[in-house]
Amino acid sequence: MRLPYRNKKVTLWVLFGIIVITMFLFKFTELRPTCLFKVDAANELSSQMVRVEKYLTDDNQRVYSYNREMPLIFIGGVPRSGTTLMRAMLDAHPDVRCGQETRVIPRILQLRSHWLKSEKESLRLQEAGITKEVMNSAIAQFCLEIIAKHGEPAPRLCNKDPLTLKMGSYVIELFPNAKFLFMVRDGRATVHSIISRKVTITGFDLSSYRQCMQKWNHAIEVMHEQCRDIGKDRCMMVYYEQLVLHPEEWMRKILKFLDVPWNDAVLHHEEFINKPNGVPLSKVERSSDQVIKPVNLEAMSKWVGQIPGDVVRDMADIAPMLSVLGYDPYANPPDYGKPDAWVQDNTSKLKANRMLWESKAKQVLQMSSSEDDNTNTIINNSNNKDNNNNQYTINKIIPEQHSRQRQHVQQQHLQQQQQQHLQQQQHQRQQQQQQREEESESEREAEPDREQQLLHQKPKDVITIKQLPLAGSNNNNINNNINNNNNNNNIMEDPMADT
């Protein structure tokens, strides 16, 4: 049966309405699922409080996300083992940002370790509902915020807190895709650097080479075990000596291990010191004056001849980890290998221009200090000048820069002389003040005797003054005697007035 035209029209409108309503309901439920479906309030609240994905934006408005699953880079090892050089070379890469050492993360990890070792603290946490998962999540978020926020955003984030590796297995538990670079250096060179530069490390007695070697042996043993437990796919041992002797070969291995593309900038980190998105330095890091230089051999064998004879004799027993790591405990110095030609050339040029590099180190540290004092304007101006000029090289030294360097050194020398003069004056004042105090103290001790003398003298003076009128003397003689008596009293009181 055929429907009339009017009925067909109504039917089409009804079908159209059904389609529109269906599409509206579908879209509405997609945007507002909680309106049609019951959602657990606790889960909803937790999802709002804990954001899995976080974002950072750089100066070019590029957005970077960071979370616990990201491939973080951790540089570990005993302090003074080349960790600062390693992070400076990585910082020169445009895709990597390490930044300065904070020491925050290892302290947080040590605090957590203390809680777990203490039965009292562990019980208190359990009773408070702080489970292992809650603790791990909180520590991971805290560490992630420190790593992500203490420098500029970058595709790959890195942290250089050497002692973090002592808890490397737990760090991998927090960040399963993270990787470690384990910096290894001859323990004799490390200990000599710690002692000569007076680097304070908990447990190290800087007055004893023997004790410091024992502490180094224990620390490196713990880190070596941690790296072995983490596995070769997550922890790579990097020998400082080989990195210095063959920088390009080892940096290619390191970047391949980290899944970071090759960039020649990592071989010239000194050109990016304190530049925007470059290699920031800190005035409190002990290696800042060294990493401003290109890769060189200066620090390779400074320890030779500096260690006491009895410690050298017992070295194999004091530090057995030397042999485990492949170092000869009886060789002074060991044969580390032959350096690349350009590294040897860098070393020769540094020796020829030692005063210039020392002056440059002072300038860089002063710039870092001014950053801490919020004088960023001065730093930006100096960076602009560096960018406008040709890049500094060792082979070519711009005369203007050389004269400025010389003037700066002269000014510093004059300031040091003035400071020494002021210190000498202050020392003299202190000696004079001390001498006055000693004199005043002796005067105080002698005061009772003097008071008794005055008491005995005063009656005689009174008798003399009374007897003068009886003898018919004039008033002038009386006044003179009175004035003489007053002068005697003043002489007795002057020393006490100085006090």
UniProtKB/Swiss-Prot annotation:
Residues 1-9 are cytoplasmic. Disulfide bonds join C98-C158, C227-C235. Its main location: Golgi. Glycans are attached at N346, N380. Keywords: Disulfide bond, Glycoprotein, Golgi apparatus, Membrane, Signal-anchor, Transferase, Transmembrane, Transmembrane helix. It comes from the Eukaryota. Residues 362-460, 476-499 are annotated as: Disordered. The active site is at E101 (proton donor/acceptor). Its EC number is 2.8.2.20. It is a single-pass type II membrane protein. The chain crosses the membrane at residues 10-30. Residues 443-460 have a biased composition (Basic and acidic residues). It is found in: Golgi apparatus membrane. GO terms for biological process: protein secretion. Residues 103-107 are annotated as: Interaction with peptide substrate. Residues 375-400, 408-434, 476-491 have a biased composition (Low complexity). One of its GO terms (molecular function) is protein-tyrosine sulfotransferase activity. The record marks K160, S287 as: Transition state stabilizer. It catalyses: L-tyrosyl-[protein] + 3'-phosphoadenylyl sulfate = O-sulfo-L-tyrosine-[protein] + adenosine 3',5'-bisphosphate + H(+). Residues 31-499 are lumenal. 3'-phosphoadenylyl sulfate binds at residues 80-84, 185, 193, 197, 240, 287-296, 302. Belongs to the protein sulfotransferase family. Catalyzes the O-sulfation of tyrosine residues within acidic motifs of polypeptides. Has a role in protein secretion. This is Protein-tyrosine sulfotransferase. It comes from Drosophila melanogaster (Fruit fly). The lineage of its organism: Eukaryota, Metazoa, Ecdysozoa, Arthropoda, Hexapoda.
